[in-house]
């Protein structure tokens, strides 16, 4: 039962953070950032927010990380307005490499298919 609540809160935070990034945060460093997953700690005090960015350049990834860290206060304040929770969890942003990994595997499979 508690695990279900943790999952629901994570999904709601994911939806709201995506919305906040699109509508409220004007920092150009976070343009093109998409939230892919939110993992909540058991006591709902910490949320790991995984994101992807369209660019593969390391400099763009670093800029996006810096922009997200700078916007954390704004995002948390807006979450406080949208969510009915006693305490809004602390947000930690991490780059999600699963999309790039999946694309690499897909490319390898296509290469194998072309060879046969």
Curated annotation (Swiss-Prot):
Pfam families in alphabetical order: RBFA
Alphabetized GO MF terms: ribosomal small subunit binding
Xref: InterPro entries: KH_dom-like_a/b, RbfA, RbfA_dom_sf, Ribosome-bd_factorA_CS
Main location: cytoplasm
Keywords, in A-Z order: Cytoplasm, Ribosome biogenesis
Family per similarity comment: Belongs to the RbfA family.
Function description: One of several proteins that assist in the late maturation steps of the functional core of the 30S ribosomal subunit. Associates with free 30S ribosomal subunits (but not with 30S subunits that are part of 70S ribosomes or polysomes). Required for efficient processing of 16S rRNA. May interact with the 5'-terminal helix region of 16S rRNA.
Name of the molecule in the record: Ribosome-binding factor A
Natural source organism: Streptococcus pyogenes serotype M5 (strain Manfredo)
Gene: rbfA
